[in-house]
UniProtKB/Swiss-Prot annotation:
Biological processes per GO annotation: protein folding; protein tetramerization; protein transport
Disordered as annotated region, ranges: 1-21
InterPro entries attached to this UniProt entry: SecB, SecB-like_sf
Protein name per Swiss-Prot or TrEMBL: Protein-export protein SecB
A single GO molecular function term of this UniProt record: unfolded protein binding
Family listed: Belongs to the SecB family.
Keywords in alphabetical order: Chaperone, Cytoplasm, Protein transport, Translocation, Transport
Taxonomic placement: Bacteria, Pseudomonadati, Pseudomonadota, Alphaproteobacteria, Hyphomicrobiales
Length: 168
């Protein structure tokens, strides 16, 4: 392979302590922090139904620095299924990942932590939820893809609105 000409790669490299560090985002580990499945009405709640249950899904993302360039990102998924005002199941998953992020400009850190990291975690968390509901006697709950960029923008807008209220 021929060497590529070197150019200004600001998007891929940033100055860190006077040294040029290639920008990288690495998953160091992934883990289940908490998993809970409840089917309070079993076995009656497992019977066949004429209509699909209503399912409410909530998603949350949190990130915490671990020191240096390492961050712990937590993706929380909760789902509650109800039919005829009876809870069929509740499932909650807190799925974490430890990420090493280096070489990116500071203004890229929040989008990386709240968009890219959960985007990498989501397929694994989705499968855990599907397996938990299937193992609980229900059809697997296949959560639709999540737009983490939109969630992040909404979060920023909510924080800005709170700041404006506090200043008033």
């Amino acid at each position: 392979m021929a060497d590529q000409p070197s150019g200004n790669n600001d998007a891929k490299q940033a100055e860190t302590n006077g040294n040029t560090v290639p920008a990288s985002l690495n998953v160091l580990t992934q883990y289940i922090k908490d998993l809970s499945f409840e089917s309070p009405g079993a076995p009656q709640s497992l019977r066949a139904r004429d209509k699909a249950p209503s399912i409410n899904i909530n998603v949350n993302v949190n990130a915490n620095p671990l020191g240096g360039t390492d961050y712990d990102v937590l993706l929380t998924l909760t789902a509650k299924a109800e039919a005829d005002n009876v809870v069929l199941f509740n499932v909650e998953l807190i799925y974490g990942g430890v990420f090493r992020i280096q070489g990116f400009p500071q203004e890229h850190m929040l989008p990386l932590l709240f968009i890219e990291c959960p985007r990498l975690l989501f397929p694994f968390a989705r499968q855990i939820i599907a397996d938990a509901t299937r193992n609980g006697g229900f059809p697997p709950l296949m959560i639709d893809p999540i737009d983490f960029a939109r969630m992040f923008q909404q979060r920023l807008a909510e924080e800005e609105a709170r700041r404006k209220v506090q200043v008033s």
